[in-house]
């Protein structure tokens, strides 16, 4: 069952028609900045993949992908993508991208096992991007520089929206604050991972939390990550404080991708060394794919944030429990 946060005295500043205009305004402006800041080319991407390819994102390892049988191929199963994290790296090679060049695409996914709430939906829409880097640039400096480029696009978008709409005030700080998961755990040793994220994000306004997926000194990871795309020592989430809901809102997840050594180590830690036999993972181990950095940026979350909406269902179409839909409507939250 979804947990619904009802902000006190909430009222959307935009009706349904004007909300659609606002969504397009946010997406068009931010996308143009992202392309320019990261040197990206838009490409077509798959909605589904062959599960035998190892190309789908296993996320935290327990989410079930949506699959279906293809009649023409004797009901051979295909899986709807959960993200394009692995496919993008493969595409950079196949499409002939050079050092410093990257791609981006609109990624639509179905997360059937998602626990829904104000910011989570079973429908996921994001800009998925990936860029070729040199092996010597697989370091925290490259990660931080890229985070700053993405954050710069976010800030400029907020400034633009504040000009377009009188009710929107700028709340993002000038600079984003960087911290590792271990530093965060040391700062708040008695709190849960989500509580730590909330405290640091509310204090700083915008935070980049780095090194996600590996176990901390207390034996627990800050958050889950699949072992075969991000290098757990070189990845990050961008979170901003969202006063409408009084939460830390994750807008983007990114990372420098695994090389041969990182992949072997992380598959061992995750207890899934059998994945090394899949085609995509074999290509990494055989050093056939380029070194890359990439990530995903939530389209609906960005629209929700910049339009100051209380629920992600105000900016995307999905299916919600009927009682949640009724309660939301009773409090001025119009779900699409």
Roles of regions detected by a PLM:
Residues 2-120, 128-132:
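Class II aminoacyl-tRNA synthetase-like tRNA-binding/catalytic domains
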Residues 21-25, 29, 138-145, 149, ...:
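Generic recognition of stable, solvent-exposed alpha-helical segments in well-folded globular domains
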Residues 34-41, 150-161, 310:
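A generic secondary-structure signal for well-formed alpha-helical elements
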Residues 50-61, 170-179, 321:
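N-terminal pre-domains immediately preceding structured catalytic cores
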Residues 68-71, 93-99, 119-121, 169, ...:
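A general structural signal for short secondary-structure junctions and capping/turn motifs
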Residues 101-103, 124-128, 204-206, 246-248:
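Extracellular structured ligand-interaction cores
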Residues 105-193:
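Extended, charged alpha-beta segments that form solvent-exposed binding/catalytic grooves
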Residues 110, 180-336:
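A translation/RNA-centric and nucleic-acid-associated enzymatic feature enriched
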């Amino acid at each position: 069952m979804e947990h619904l946060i009802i902000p006190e005295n909430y009222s959307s500043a935009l009706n349904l028609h004007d909300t659609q205009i606002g969504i397009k305004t946010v997406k068009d402006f931010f996308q143009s900045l992202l392309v320019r800041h990261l040197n990206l080319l838009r490409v077509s991407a798959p909605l589904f993949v062959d599960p035998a390819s190892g190309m789908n994102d296993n996320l935290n390892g327990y989410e079930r992908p949506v699959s279906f049988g293809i009649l023409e191929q004797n009901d051979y199963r295909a899986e709807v993508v959960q993200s394009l994290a692995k496919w993008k790296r493969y595409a950079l090679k196949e499409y002939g991208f050079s050092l410093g060049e990257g791609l981006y695409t609109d990624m639509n996914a179905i997360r059937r096992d998602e626990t829904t709430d104000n910011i989570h939906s079973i429908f996921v829409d994001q800009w998925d991007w990936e860029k070729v880097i040199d092996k010597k640039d697989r370091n925290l400096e490259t990660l931080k520089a890229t985070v700053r480029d993405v954050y710069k696009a976010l800030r400029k978008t907020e400034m633009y929206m504040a000009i377009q709409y009188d009710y929107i005030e700028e709340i993002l700080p000038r600079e984003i604050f960087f911290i590792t998961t271990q530093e965060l755990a040391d700062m708040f040793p008695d709190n849960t991972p989500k509580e730590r994220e909330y405290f640091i994000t509310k204090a700083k306004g915008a935070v980049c939390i780095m090194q996600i997926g590996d176990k901390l000194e207390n034996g627990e990871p800050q958050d889950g990550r699949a072992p075969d795309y991000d290098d757990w020592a070189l990845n990050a989430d961008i979170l901003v404080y969202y006063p409408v809901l009084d939460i830390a809102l994750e807008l983007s997840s990114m990372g420098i991708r695994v090389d041969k050594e990182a992949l072997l180590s992380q598959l061992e830690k995750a207890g899934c060394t059998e994945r090394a036999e899949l085609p995509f993972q074999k290509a990494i181990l055989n050093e056939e794919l380029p070194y890359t950095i990439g990530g995903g940026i939530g389209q609906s979350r960005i629209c929700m944030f910049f339009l100051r909406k209380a629920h992600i269902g105000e900016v995307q179409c999905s299916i919600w429990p009927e009682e949640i839909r009724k309660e939301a409507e009773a409090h001025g939250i119009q779900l699409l």
